[in-house]
Curated annotation (Swiss-Prot):
Note on how the cofactor is bound: Binds 1 zinc ion per subunit.
GO MF term list: metal ion binding; rhamnulose-1-phosphate aldolase activity
Organism lineage string: Bacteria, Pseudomonadati, Pseudomonadota, Gammaproteobacteria, Enterobacterales
Keyword terms, alphabetized: Cytoplasm, Lyase, Metal-binding, Rhamnose metabolism, Zinc
Name listed for the protein in its UniProt record: Rhamnulose-1-phosphate aldolase
Length: 274
């Protein structure tokens, strides 16, 4: 019998959650991570599945995700503990045939349930499937320290925030030319914040929750982690720059345009226009 804990997707989740913890982005039970799988990914591990998978209804049907398996982090679980006990802190779930709920096939032992932000994740998965033709498979939420700090001092406007991050590090425009979406402050763990996040995910692979954290989307765990890491590095640079009295010089609009042309990306027009 093959052990599911040695699968690429469980090992990938262990690495991503451990790295995020070591970065300081996921204190206590902060943060959540979901990865969309295919049936072929989980097929070799049926012998590991629960004999009687628990069924949990979704707060709203998501037919686009019907019959789709995911691996998810659990509600109230600490990222730092995933590596110690994957089965207690992670779960493989599969949405039912009409998208009305899901079965917990593996993991989430002792009656644990998926992350409270599952509505935001699933709604965002729906939008990123449409926006990327199914390429994006990962949604990651974490409390990236410097990005959060900037939401207290920068105007919480997509164009303004995006332009500042692009100027904070040359690679940013190349990595997220579509910019950073920003919500107003909202109560987490609700359908409302999930719907607002998904709406921004139609246009942006990064979405900031002011005074709280960031959502990122990408095709792989590495790409999604790297996306957030790149934005957070720029935010760290900006925090240092602002604390030293602000910018004396920076990357110009013309230089940003040249950067986009060199790497074949189209920068967010509203940020470029500032």
């Amino acid at each position: 019998m093959q052990n599911i804990t040695q699968s690429w997707f469980v090992q990938g989740m262990i690495k991503a959650t451990t790295d995020a913890w070591l970065k300081g982005w996921d204190e206590r039970n902060g943060g959540n991570l979901t990865l969309r799988l295919d049936d072929a990914d989980i097929a070799p591990y049926h012998d590991n599945f629960h004999a009687q998978p628990r069924y949990i209804p979704l707060s709203q049907p998501m037919p686009l995700l019907a019959n789709t398996p995911f691996i998810v982090t659990g509600s109230g679980k600490f990222f730092r503990n995933v590596q110690l006990d994957p089965a207690a802190n992670l779960g493989v779930v599969k949405v039912d045939s009409d998208g009305a709920g899901y079965h917990i096939l593996w993991g989430l032992t002792h009656e644990a349930v998926p992350t409270s932000e599952l509505p935001a994740h699933f709604l965002s998965h729906c939008e990123r499937i449409k926006a990327t033709n199914g390429k994006d498979r990962v949604i990651m939420h974490c409390h990236a320290t410097n990005l959060i700090a900037l939401t207290y001092v920068l105007e919480n406007d997509t164009a303004v925030f995006t332009r500042q991050l692009w100027e904070g590090s040359t690679e940013c425009l190349v990595v997220f030319p579509d910019g950073v979406g920003i919500l107003p402050w909202m109560v987490p763990g609700t359908d409302e914040i999930g719907q607002a996040t998904a709406q921004e995910m139609q246009k942006h692979s990064l979405v900031l929750w002011p005074f709280h954290g960031v959502f990122g989307s990408g095709p792989t765990l590495d790409e999604t982690f790297g996306l957030i890491d790149t934005a957070e590095k720029s935010a760290q640079v900006l925090v240092k720059v602002y604390s030293m009295g602000g910018m004396k010089q920076t990357i110009s609009r013309e230089e940003l345009i040249a950067l986009g042309q060199r790497f074949g990306v189209t920068p967010l027009a509203s940020a470029l226009a500032l």
